[in-house]
Amino acid sequence: MDLDQERSLDGTYIMPTFGRLPVLFTHGEGMRLYDDTGKEYLDFLAGIGVCCLGHGHPALVNALTHQTEQLLHVSNYYYIEHRAEVAALLSKLANNDMEGAERLARALRSGDAQAAMDAAQPAAGEQVWQTFFANSGAEANECSLKLARLYAQRHGNGGNAIVCLHGGFHGRTLETLAATMQERLQEPFQPLPGGFLMCEPNDIDGLQELFAQHGKQIAGILIEPIQGESGVHPLTTEFVHEAAELAHAAGALLISDEVQAGMFRCGTPFAIQALGITPDIMSLAKGIAGGVPCGACVARAEIARTFAPGEHGTTFGGSNLAVAAAEAVLCELICGAYGEHAVHAGTYLMERLDALPCVTEVRGRGLMVGCDLAPDACDAHDLVAALLDDGFVLNATGDHTLRFLPPLICTSDDINLLVDALAHRLEQAG
């Protein structure tokens, strides 16, 4: 079907939860997408930070092709081939142990089971992290919240409140929506679950006051090192360090939502690592499996073991297909130095954006970038639509804010094409 036919059926049969742009993508390769007419687009959104290797990457395609011929799903009642190995990769990445992660990744790629078994073993004194595999970022955050509260009840301070930051985004379920401190998103679905406290991002005084007032009632603090949906707003190093210190002094846990900023998008395996902080729990999704639905809650083992069988679960999470995708993506990211490339490419993108006369601020790290337009420049949503006509895919998070989340294979040539087109459209609007 062509775009018009698909739009007609979409309007009849699909719930109206998204306002869609008028394009029907049919296939992609690398940084490029193609629509039903054959038109080519440069993708600077990557399915909202999901397709970290771009489109049609051979490592992912081969892994999925092989797995679909073998086994798709059997449920969590049984052991899943390579699931523990993927969890071991995540454990080593959580320790920022790139040498250990690469040794395991190369063993997995070689197909040498004994070498992989040996590489997966934790070294003496190594912090072990355990993983619960889910299907999405919201599910990963649900698991993180449940684990933090359960840990507080059984081993911590007995609290159940979770501190969240204004402008954050943690999902669309009722619980994660309650943690998403954006009134416009929460209002239609009141009453939401309770037990959440709000603080302004980077407000150290406000955070200290919150802990002084509520102290032992707090089970955890949930942060995004870089708030994505509100326009790519990084937390300061000082604020995150204070959050960690206050949480641990109160017997609470620090939870890092790495759904958008993690998986080497900002350089380090997880964005919080660039701030010199190790959290207690992390929520992952988006880029972890390159486009196959997959999420993960990763926690220090001594915290993760709070769960007992039957206290949390999933039907589809950690399926054979999702694990195969995650293994292929993680091995490629680890062995291919994608984090270093993301930093270099992101720095160049920010420099080019910052040089545009209508841009008032550029924010971000690596290939997670946002920029604000002058209020009298043009509407960001109109600009996104115009650039789509020009063959570029990006995103607006507000009337004057653009967001860039390209695949981690993005080159300086790709960036030049985009920014030149953006400059032309801004000049026309002015």
Give the residues covered by each predicted segment:
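Conserved N-terminal phosphate-binding loop of PLP-dependent enzymes in the Aspartate aminotransferase
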Residues: M1-G430
